[in-house]
């Protein structure tokens, strides 16, 4: 069954580009928007005070209801900014005429009005869990998507049916394996194992909730897909794990048994011409500083494969040492590893090019739990969520590197990443100070970036370099100033900024 979704009042830039007179506010320019919540343009939504909007949407519903035999129509309702409604004379007049006191209830008016029209066509209404922020339309079926989908339970409390599609687990736009091997997308990981182990019915649920749960849904957004094969790659095999989540009896999950069944089914899926990901065979890594050495840890979500590795840069084979436990290195080392089953390499080869410098393996004092990545010898990729970047959101950063003893330092660099589409930018200022007692610091360098450098529209890794230092010191302190918010005209205008760093290099 194909259920149509007609988004309202937000995520409507495609229609507003063609019918700008329906926008709030009316714009005399093309309205484009990035994936997700894309800056100021995402604040442009349908005008709740303009009756022409409802006439237009009713015409759309008339056609959709005739085209699709499904008894359901999804009306969206998610991520609707109220900024322009709050200052729009028409919207304010609507609130006064309908005796609406709070702006959230204006969305309830909007959605209820359209819901009633859909119901007049003999259809049932579905919507995202933001509808629970105000009065729910009668009979609306709610999709729980934010976080782990708990907002849907607010609808269940009122006797509404609901569907679980938590972004944290069932958004298939997320990376399905170690990000080093995956096509670029956004956010974090939702691995095959994450999907399979998801339990939609929680122990603390009231008995009534389970009877109102209609099922589960995996959501696949295609902003980063340019072909059907790209979409299939994101769907399979995670879609098969979702089927198990939906159909299996509670408490019967068996990960190894599922993999055995999956191995029998995947060849059939591929004979149908589908593109299937093999990410479940790829290796996760973690490299941590430990007593002036680096500890290398490798893992794979499949328990039925062997990991073989080398430390001399050669390709691993079944004859290479088998990984049974973590190991340490104390010099520049090129580690390569891959998974094997029945003598055949199953996953892609992981390459860890561990480059040693005076900072490698040394402790970092910082507020972030994963600040160890600053001295673990591994450079990050263009994916700032690949586990090799440590980030600060909407705040300045300060961290101290302990070299262990007074050391001659001539050059220091700090790896920074820019991903303008995700509001990830270089700092405004980086200050470098030195100390030998960890109390009294002396500034020896400052890098100031211009707005043009900070907000360049690109994705890139760049090192902030302090050279010609000629100083003997034990402690290096980095003080980093956050640029604030993305400026007017930026693709993420008005959004707060992330700063990410991957490696401190000292020579």
Where do the language-model regions lie?
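An acidic- and aromatic-residue-enriched active-site/binding cleft used to recognize and process polar
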Residues: 5-11, 78-80, 130-133, 145-147, ...
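Substrate-binding cleft of carbohydrate-active enzyme catalytic domains
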Residues: 1-125
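Flexible, acidic glycine-rich loops studded with aromatic residues
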Residues: 124-130, 135-140, 146-295
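Aromatic, loop-rich ligand-recognition surfaces of beta-strand-rich domains
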Residues: 383-445, 458-507
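Short, compositionally stereotyped local motifs that mark structural "simplifiers"
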Residues: 249, 253-400, 417, 426
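Structured core elements
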Residues: 3-5, 45-47, 72-76, 126-127, ...
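Solvent-exposed serine/threonine-rich low-complexity stretches and specific carbohydrate-binding patches
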Residues: 443-453
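Flexible loop/turn segments at secondary-structure boundaries
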Residues: 9-15, 74, 80-85, 132-137, ...
């Amino acid at each position: 069954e194909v259920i149509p979704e007609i988004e309202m009042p937000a995520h409507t830039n495609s229609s507003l580009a063609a019918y700008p007179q329906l926008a709030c506010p009316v714009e005399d320019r093309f309205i484009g928007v990035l994936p997700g919540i894309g800056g100021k343009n995402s604040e442009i939504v349908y005008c709740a005070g303009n009756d022409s909007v409802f006439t237009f949407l009713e015409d759309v519903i008339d056609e959709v209801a005739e085209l699709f035999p499904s008894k359901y129509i999804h009306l969206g309702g998610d991520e609707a900014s109220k900024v322009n409604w709050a200052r729009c004379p028409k919207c304010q007049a609507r609130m006064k005429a309908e005796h609406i006191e709070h702006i959230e209830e204006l969305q309830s008016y909007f959605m209820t009005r359209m819901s009633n029209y859909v119901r007049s066509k003999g259809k049932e209404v579905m919507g995202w869990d933001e509808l629970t922020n105000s009065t729910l339309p009668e009979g609306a079926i709610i999709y729980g998507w934010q976080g782990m989908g708990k907002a849907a339970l607010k609808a269940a409390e009122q006797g509404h049916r609901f569907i679980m599609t938590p972004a944290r687990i069932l958004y298939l736009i997320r990376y399905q394996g170690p990000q080093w091997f995956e096509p670029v997308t956004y956010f974090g990981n939702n691995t095959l194992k994450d999907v399979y182990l998801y339990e939609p019915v929680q122990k603390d649920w009231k008995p009534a909730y389970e009877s109102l749960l209609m099922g589960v849904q995996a959501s696949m957004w295609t902003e980063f897909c340019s072909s059907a094969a790209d979409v299939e790659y994101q769907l399979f095999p995670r879609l098969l794990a979702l089927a198990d989540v939906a159909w299996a009896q509670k408490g019967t999950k068996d990960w190894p048994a599922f993999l055995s069944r999956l191995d029998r089914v995947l060849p059939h899926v591929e004979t149908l011409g589908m593109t299937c990901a093999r990410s479940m065979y790829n290796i996760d890594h973690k490299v941590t500083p430990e007593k002036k050495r680096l500890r290398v840890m490798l893992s794979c979500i499949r328990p039925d494969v062997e990991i073989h590795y080398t430390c001399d840069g050669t390709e691993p084979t079944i004859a290479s040492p088998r990984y049974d436990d973590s190991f340490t290195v104390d010099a520049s080392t090129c580690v390569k590893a891959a998974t094997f089953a029945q003598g055949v390499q199953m996953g892609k080869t992981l390459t860890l090019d561990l480059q040693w410098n005076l900072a490698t393996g040394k402790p970092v004092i910082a507020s972030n739990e994963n600040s160890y990545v600053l001295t673990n010898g591994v450079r990050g990729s263009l994916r700032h969520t690949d586990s090799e970047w440590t980030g600060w959101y909407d705040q300045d950063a300060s961290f101290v590197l302990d070299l262990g003893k007074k050391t001659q330092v001539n050059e220091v660099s700090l790896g920074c990443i820019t991903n303008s589409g995700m509001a990830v930018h270089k700092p405004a200022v980086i200050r470098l100070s030195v100390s030998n007692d960890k109390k009294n610091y002396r500034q020896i360098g400052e890098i100031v970036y211009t707005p043009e450098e900070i907000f360049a529209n690109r994705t890139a890794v760049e090192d902030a370099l302090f050279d010609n230092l000629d100083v003997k010191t034990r402690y290096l302190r980095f003080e980093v100033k956050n640029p604030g918010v993305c400026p007017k005209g930026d693709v993420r205008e008005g959004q707060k900024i992330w700063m990410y760093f991957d490696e401190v290099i000292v020579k």
